[in-house]
């Protein structure tokens, strides 16, 4: 099943997303987390949804119904290491376009798999909101998610959401507004031993998101974080 320009706005194959003076909000996430459902709910467009990996190959953009923003639905991917076309498209957009904020959609029924991508994006920009989608499915499975505790650990807003029913979407928009106006200052970034980062630097295989500049924390460990994003 393909995507059409009439159903999803403008695709990357036509020169990227449509140029606009509006703030740009990127929607990122693994395949099958309901990211396109979030996009549809916020824009009123009809991006095709499905339960197969790699469905969204190109960028799809649309104007938010309730806020003066341009939303960009990035291809579903599991990391920002460009091992696939989807990962390369998502990585390049976040790195080069520098959206005003990023909403990272996670699967409430499988947080551990979704969090890896979220942590990579937090290393690029602090203007991140974590949208834990499919919370209704998680409740059916008896899964409880402590959003407040997760927010404290990550240092960025965390919103519980069910895009199909509309639960949490207003809270998601409010959280995005907050991070654009006041970017979080104490976001969680993975810290690596100095020996690891020195080896990666010398081998030329620094993972995306890691700074080439040596930064140490109070314990003398190397900090990994992309420092160029303002």
Name what the model sees in each region.
Residues 1-16, 119, 136, 155, ...:
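Conserved P-loop NTPase architecture
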């Amino acid at each position: 099943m393909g995507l059409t320009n009439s159903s999803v706005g403008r695709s990357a194959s036509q020169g990227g997303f449509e140029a606009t003076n509006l703030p740009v909000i990127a929607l990122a996430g693994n395949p099958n987390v309901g990211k396109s459902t979030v996009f549809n709910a916020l824009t009123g467009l009809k991006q095709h949804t499905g339960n197969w990996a790699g469905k969204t190959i190109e960028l799809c953009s649309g104007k938010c119904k309730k806020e003066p923003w341009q939303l960009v639905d990035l291809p579903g991917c599991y990391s920002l290491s460009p091992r696939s076309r989807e990962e390369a498209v998502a990585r390049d957009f976040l790195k080069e376009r520098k959206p005003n904020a990023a909403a990272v959609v996670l699967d409430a029924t499988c947080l551990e798999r979704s969090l890896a991508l979220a942590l990579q994006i937090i290393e690029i920009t602090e203007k991140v909101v974590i949208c834990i989608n499919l919370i209704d499915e998680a409740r059916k499975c008896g899964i409880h998610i402590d959003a407040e505790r997760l927010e404290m650990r990550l240092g960025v807003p965390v919103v519980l959401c069910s895009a199909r029913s509309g639960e949490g979407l207003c809270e998601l928009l409010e959280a995005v507004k907050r991070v654009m106006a006041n970017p979080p200052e104490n976001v969680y970034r993975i810290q690596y031993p100095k020996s690891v980062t020195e080896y990666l630097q010398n081998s030329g295989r620094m993972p995306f998101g890691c700074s080439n500049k040596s930064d140490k924390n109070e314990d003398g460990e190397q900090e990994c974080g992309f420092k160029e994003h303002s």
